[in-house]
C-alpha cells in the first residue's frame, strides 16, 4: 500500500488497471485534480513499464547472418508479434495474461502441469527446444541432414523414410521445430507433406514440406495410427508448426505424431463468415461458367440443369418450358418462326392443292342446292355417329403419327411438349400428317395442322365461287364404303340398308 503524505478525511477505493507491480487497491482523494507527488511518481513509473513483456526461453547464441544462411531462427525465440494481449488482474498471487481472442494469442503447454502459459511455466520454467542441425537451404537431401542429435532418419528398401530415437531418452515436454517448407496462401492442403495453419485473419495457409531441399527432418515423422504408439503432439504457435513430446521417448523408439487438442480446435475455429464466403465464391463461379455455356450454345433451349431447379425439387428430366424463364427471348423467337413457316407453307400450297382437296375430302363445306341440303347434313350426322360408335367399339378412334404419343388424357402435357408429334381429330388431318410431301419441314403443333386444313378449304371454296361453277353433290355411299374407317362390317350394313330403302336420294335420311 502507498503511504499518503498527509491524512485524508474522505477516501475512495478505486481499482488501478494500469499498474501490474503495485497493489490493486489505491487511495485517491475525492478531488481528482489534486493528487500527491507520490501518486504522480508511481503513475509515471508505471506508464513506462506497461506493455513491456519479456519472454524467457533457453536459446543458443547465433548471429543474424547464420539465421539467414540456414533459413531458420537459431535462437528459437517465439514471435512477439503474435502476442497481442490485454493485461488484466486475476485472483491469486501471480498475474496471468488473459487474451483478447484465442486465435490472436499463442500459448505454450506444459506437459507436466497440463496447463497453458505465455512466457514460462510457473513450476517448470520456459519451454525447452531441441535445435536442428544447421544445414543451408538448397543442399540436396537437406531434410535428412537437419536431424537433431540423438535421432536418425532411416530409409528402407522401398524408399520410405522414418525417424527413430537413438542413444538417449528425449524427455517429456521437449519441443521440436518449427516445421519448414514452402508457405502457400491458398486455403487447402498442398500434399502429403503439408500442414495447415490459421493466420490472424482467420484464413487457412499451408506449409508444404515436399521439397527436400527446403524442408527439415520433421517431414519424415509418420502420423500415429494408434494412441498407444503416439509420442509427439503437433500444435501451432505463431503461424508455425511444432512437435511436442507428450511422454518420454526412449532409444530405439520410432517417432509418431498426432494432432494436439488445441491445434484441432484452431483448425475448426474458422469463422462461419469465411465458410459462407468460400461457398458464395464457388457458387458464383459455377453460375458464371453455366452462363458462358448458354451463350456459346444459344439454340439449345434445354441447356444445363441449374441449381435452382434442383433446390425446388423439380425433375431435370421433365421438360415443361421452365427453361423459358432463363431464355424468354429465344423461346418467343422460335415459336414465331414456327407459326410463320406454317402460314407461308399453307398459303403457297393452297392454290396448287385446292382442286385435289375439293374432290378428295368429304368434310369441305360446300354450297349445294336447297333440295339436297337437308339430306346432306343428315347423312353427315349419321356418318359422324357411326364413326364414333366404331371408334368406341374397336378403340381405334385416335389417329397416331410418330410412335410414343400417348392417348391418355393425363399425358396431354407430354403430347404438347413434343413438337414432332400430335393427335389428329379426323382422317383428313391424319392423311395430311402422314404424307411427308404435304407438310412443311418445320415441326408444329396440332393447331397448325387444323389451320393449314382450314386455309385450304377456304381457298378451294373461293376458287369455286370465282369460277362460277357449282360443285356437284358427292355420291356419299360409294365414297364412304372406300374409306378405311368404314371397313367394319357393321358400318357397311348400315349404309347398305340406307341405300336399299332409297332414303338417301329421297331426302328421308334421319327422318
From Swiss-Prot:
Compartments it resides in: Nucleus; Cytoplasm
Tissue expression profile of the protein: Highly expressed in lung, including bronchial epithelial cells and airway smooth muscle cells, as well as in peripheral blood mononuclear cells. In tonsils, expressed in B-cell types, including naive B-cells, centroblasts, centrocytes and memory B-cells (at protein level). In benign hyperplastic lymph nodes, expressed in germinal center cells in both the dark and light zones, as well as in scattered cells in the mantle zone and the interfollicular area (at protein level).
UniProt cross-references to Pfam families, sorted A to Z: PRDM2_PR
Residues in SET domain copies: 149-260
Covalent link Glycyl lysine isopeptide (Lys-Gly) (interchain with G-Cter in SUMO2), residues: 88, 155, 172, 200, 214
Enzyme type, top EC level: transferase
Effect of residue 285 to S: In a patient with diffuse large B-cell lymphoma; uncertain significance
Gene3D superfamilies named in the record: SET domain
Phosphoserine: residues carrying this PTM: 63
Superkingdom per UniProt: Eukaryota
Gene Ontology molecular-function annotations: chromatin binding; DNA-binding transcription factor activity; methyltransferase activity; RNA polymerase II cis-regulatory region sequence-specific DNA binding
A GO CC term assigned to this protein in UniProt: nucleus
GO biological process assignments: cell fate commitment; methylation; negative regulation of cell growth; negative regulation of DNA-templated transcription; positive regulation of DNA-templated transcription; positive regulation of fibroblast apoptotic process; regulation of cell cycle; regulation of MAPK cascade
Enzyme Commission code(s) on record: 2.1.1.-
Keyword annotations of the record: Cytoplasm, Isopeptide bond, Methyltransferase, Nucleus, Phosphoprotein, S-adenosyl-L-methionine, Transcription, Transcription regulation, Transferase, Ubl conjugation
Role summary: May be involved in transcription regulation.
Family: Belongs to the class V-like SAM-binding methyltransferase superfamily.
PANTHER family per record: PR DOMAIN ZINC FINGER PROTEIN (PTHR16515), PR DOMAIN-CONTAINING PROTEIN 11 (PTHR16515:SF48)
Protein name: PR domain-containing protein 11
Highest classification ranks of the organism: Eukaryota, Metazoa, Chordata, Craniata, Vertebrata
